[in-house]
Amino acid sequence: MNKPFNCIGIVGHPRHPTALATHEMLYHWLTEKGYSVLIEQQIARELNLKDAPTGSLADIGQQADLAVVVGGDGNMLGAARVLSRYDIKVIGVNRGNLGFLTDLDPDHAQQQLSDVLDGHYLSEQRFMLEAHVCRTNQPDSISTAINEVVLHPGKVAHMIEFEVYIDDRFAFSQRSDGLIIATPTGSTAYSLSAGGPILTPSLEAIALVPMFPHTLSARPLVINSSSTIRLKFSCITNDLEISCDSQIALPVQEGEEVLIRRSEHHLNLIHPKNYSYFNTLSSKLGWSKKLF
C-alpha cells in the first residue's frame, strides 16, 4: 500500500527542553520508520544533529508532504503563514498552553502520529486574511494572518477615530482603542477575549470586534469572508499599527488606509481521526460536561 506521506518536515521554535526532546524523539522515530525527514535548521543546530537533512520553512513547504509543528499555537501561526503558500499538510504537537491548533498530546504523539501516517486523519482548510497598508506613492506593506488582523495604537494607548467600509460601502464609524478582524480560527483567540463570537471553522465568515469602543452601541459584526474591509482614518497624530497574529506589525501613517481581505492561500490542517472541534472547545475553555 502506498504511504500517504513520504517526506516529513519537523518545525518549531523550542523555548523549553521538553519541546526539544519532542523534536529529537520525532526525528529519530520517523527516521527509524523509513521516512525521509527534513528538520528545520534552528532545531537541528540546537539538537546538534550534524548529519540530519535541514531546511528553511520554505524548503519544508516545497519538499515535504507533511509538516509536524511542535510547540504552542504561536509556533503554529508563525509556521502557517509560510507553509500555507505550499501544497503541504500540517499537524501540531502541543508543547504550549491552550493548543487550539496543536492537537497531538506529546505523551502519546507516537501512537497518534502513527495513525495519521497510515492515512487515518481528518483534513480541513483554514482560510487566512491578507492585510495591506495602502500608500500613495509607495508599494503597499502586506502581511497575512491565520487568526486575526488587529488595528491598535502603537507604543502609547489612545483613542482611534476611523471609518469602516465593507465592499467599498460605508458601514460604520467608530472611536475606540482599535478593531479586531478575526477568522473563524482566530475567533477563539484575541477576538474571544474582546467579547467576539465563536465561529466554527467551516464558516465562511469574518468577525469585526471593537476594542473598548467609546459607545455602548458598538457591537461585534459578522460578515461574509468574501467581503473586503477598508479602514479610513480622520487624522493620525499618534502611532498607529496593524498587527497580524500578534507577530508582525505594520505601521500606519497619515494619509494611509488599511485594506483587509481573504487571502488566496489557506492552511491545510489535519487532525487525528477522533478529533472533535466541540470537544476541543469544551476542554480548552472549561465548558460544562455532558449531563447524561
From Swiss-Prot:
Cellular component GO terms held in the UniProt record: cytoplasm
Cofactor field: a divalent metal cation
One Pfam family per UniProt: NAD_kinase_C
Keyword Nucleotide-binding: yes
Swiss-Prot/TrEMBL keywords: ATP-binding, Cytoplasm, Kinase, NAD, NADP, Nucleotide-binding, Transferase
Enzyme class: transferase
Catalytic activity: NAD(+) + ATP = ADP + NADP(+) + H(+)
Signal sequence residues: none
UniProt main location, coarse: cytoplasm
Disulfide bonds: none
Active site: residue positions: D73 (proton acceptor)
InterPro entries hit by this protein: ATP-NAD_kinase_N, ATP-NAD_kinase_PpnK-typ_C, NAD/diacylglycerol_kinase_sf, NADK
Similarity annotation: Belongs to the NAD kinase family.
Biological role stated in the UniProt entry: Involved in the regulation of the intracellular balance of NAD and NADP, and is a key enzyme in the biosynthesis of NADP. Catalyzes specifically the phosphorylation on 2'-hydroxyl of the adenosine moiety of NAD to yield NADP.
UniProt-recorded name of the protein: NAD kinase
